[in-house]
């Protein structure tokens, strides 16, 4: 199944929709717990995205760019929180277990051709 690119027109430009990102993330790993995903037309000073644990909600702040990478990062927080049990609840948000999950998701995304880092692709000499 191909990922449909539905755009979201914002004051900063066109971005893929929340449904696009949910499909993208489920292709990498179909998580066990449902979550809400919002693409927000806002640019906070310090973050490109946020995972709100108690609401199982991912927010991606579109103007920052790197949307797929941000979506995977916040999805890793969701998986860490919902699938690693009480052990994850006491751990730092960016502890070793989180980075293991994030790294695994990124590897799968690259292997499936869903994520290509532009800096790597641009500099590759094949």
Predicted regions and their residues:
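Post-HExxH zinc-binding segment in Zn-dependent metallohydrolases
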Residues: 87-126
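Short pre-active-site segment immediately N-terminal to the catalytic Zn-binding motif
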Residues: 54-71, 85-90
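Short, solvent-exposed loop/turn segments at secondary-structure junctions
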Residues: 42-45, 65, 76, 85
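A metal-dependent hydrolase signature that marks the N-terminal structural subdomain at the beginning
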Residues: 1-40
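Catalytic glutamate of the conserved HExxH
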Residues: 70, 74-82
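Catalytic zinc-binding patch centered on the HExxH motif and its immediate surroundings
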Residues: 38-57
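A structural signal for well-ordered alpha-helical segments within the folded catalytic domains
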Residues: 19, 65-66, 96, 100
């Amino acid at each position: 199944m191909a990922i449909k690119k539905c755009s979201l027109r914002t004051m900063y430009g066109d971005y893929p929709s929340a449904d696009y990102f949910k499909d993208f993330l489920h292709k990498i790993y179909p998580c066990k717990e449902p979550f809400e995903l919002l693409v927000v037309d806002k640019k906070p000073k310090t973050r490109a995205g946020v995972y709100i644990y108690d609401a199982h909600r991912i927010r991606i702040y579109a103007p920052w760019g790197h949307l797929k990478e941000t979506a995977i990062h916040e999805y890793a927080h969701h998986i860490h929180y919902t699938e690693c049990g009480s052990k994850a609840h006491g751990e730092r948000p960016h502890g070793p277990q989180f980075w293991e999950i994030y790294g695994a998701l990124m590897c799968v995304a690259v292997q499936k051709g869903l994520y290509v880092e532009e800096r790597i692709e641009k500099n590759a000499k094949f």
